[in-house]
């Protein structure tokens, strides 16, 4: 099938590679323009651009896909379908209408749950134990289009957003190939989403990473897992930011105030319910280290408090 692929992040790369392996003709790959990255702020290609070039595919990087030139570019390709995975721009109706089989999206949730930009992260933060991927035809709404196929999977109790994202990217790639085959054969019956069951997964903000020690330890642990790599789960230590990379909830009977250090070996911090064992932390401007090394190096004492002061 003659296709156009639209995508930008690493999550989209397995789908692009799977589509090519399946024998589809990818006539063009649209991805976001090169953006400044790193300390030197030098323009860097997106993961999808890098993958497309490695596959010898044509790459097109319009600033705005809704402008006349990109629309005419896409019209001239004459693709039967388009595939979109994390492209990063809203697709206007006049572009949606160009592909006879529609624009097919891989979304990292079991729609209609977790519509939006952060389904992987929010599913973990909210303590979900199962999630999955959905292929759908996009429409003018936010992840509201007709569903095509789904595949579910368990979320591991210690799995973080990066690990889950890598797994869902592979699941989504396989599901997308099956979706294209089903559309071509006419065996897929699109299913309307039940808006009454919809939940949202909004774009992450830096303040989402702030730890509220009054929450149960399990909820804080889920935030630590879910918000990696950005914005990350953060608290304060002696008035300075402290990033928590790994943790473990502990059932502990204690009367200490939330945020108080209960023990230093292992490093246990009181929460609204139970305690959180810190396993790996990072002070601002320093490397990630085991929490035991942090406690020793800072001469941490019991009853010191985390979370005091502003991030």
UniProtKB/Swiss-Prot annotation:
| Reaction(s) catalysed by this chain's protein | L-methionyl-tRNA(fMet) + (6R)-10-formyltetrahydrofolate = N-formyl-L-methionyl-tRNA(fMet) + (6S)-5,6,7,8-tetrahydrofolate + H(+)
Q: Does the keyword Transferase apply?
A: yes
Binding residues for (6S)-5,6,7,8-tetrahydrofolate: 109-112
- A molecular function GO annotation: methionyl-tRNA formyltransferase activity
- Gene Ontology annotations for the cellular component aspect, listed alphabetically: cytosol
Q: Which InterPro entries match?
A: Fmt, Formyl_trans_C, Formyl_transf_N, Formyl_transf_N_sf, Formyl_transferase-like_C_sf, Met-tRNA-FMT_C, Met-tRNA-FMT_N
Recorded E.C. number(s)?
Answer: 2.1.2.9
Output the superkingdom of the source species: Bacteria
| UniProt KW keywords | Protein biosynthesis, Transferase
Question: Pfam families attached here?
Answer: Formyl_trans_C, Formyl_trans_N
Q: Which family does it belong to?
A: Belongs to the Fmt family.
HAMAP family linked: Formyl_trans
The function of this protein is: Attaches a formyl group to the free amino group of methionyl-tRNA(fMet). The formyl group appears to play a dual role in the initiator identity of N-formylmethionyl-tRNA by promoting its recognition by IF2 and preventing the misappropriation of this tRNA by the elongation apparatus.
Q: What is this protein called?
A: Methionyl-tRNA formyltransferase
Q: According to the entry, what is the taxonomic lineage of the organism?
A: Bacteria, Pseudomonadati, Acidobacteriota, Terriglobia, Bryobacterales
Give the gene name: fmt
């Amino acid at each position: 099938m003659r296709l156009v692929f639209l995508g930008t992040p690493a999550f989209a790369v397995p789908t692009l590679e799977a589509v090519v392996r399946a024998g589809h003709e990818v006539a063009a790959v649209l991805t976001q323009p090169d953006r400044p990255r790193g300390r030197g702020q030098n323009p860097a290609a997106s993961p999808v651009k890098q993958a497309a070039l490695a596959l010898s595919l044509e790459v097109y990087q319009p600033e705005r896909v809704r402008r006349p030139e990109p629309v005419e570019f896409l019209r001239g390709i004459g693709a039967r379908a388009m595939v979109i995975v994390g492209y990063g721009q809203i697709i206007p109706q006049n572009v949606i209408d160009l592909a006879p089989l529609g624009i097919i999206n891989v979304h990292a949730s079991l729609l209609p749950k977790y519509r939006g930009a952060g389904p992987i992260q929010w599913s973990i933060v909210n303590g979900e134990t199962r999630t999955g991927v959905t292929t759908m035809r996009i429409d003018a709404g936010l992840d509201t289009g007709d569903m095509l196929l789904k595949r579910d999977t368990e979320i591991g109790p210690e799995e973080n957003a990066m690990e889950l994202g890598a797994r869902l990217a592979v699941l989504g790639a396989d599901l997308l190939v099956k979706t294209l085959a089903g559309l071509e054969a006419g065996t897929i019956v699109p299913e309307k989403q039940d808006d009454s069951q919809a939940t949202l997964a909004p774009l992450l903000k830096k303040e989402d990473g702030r730890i509220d020690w009054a929450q149960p330890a399990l909820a804080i642990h889920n935030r630590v897992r879910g918000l990696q790599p950005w914005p990350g789960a953060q608290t304060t230590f002696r008035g300075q930011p402290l990033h928590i990379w790994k943790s473990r909830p502990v059932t502990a009977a204690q009367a200490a105030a939330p945020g108080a250090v209960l023990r230093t070996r292992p490093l246990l911090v009181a929460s609204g319910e139970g305690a959180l064992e810190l396993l790996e932390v990072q002070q601002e401007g320093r490397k990630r280290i085991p929490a035991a090394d942090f406690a020793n190096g800072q001469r941490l004492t019991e009853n010191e408090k985390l979370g005091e002061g502003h991030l």
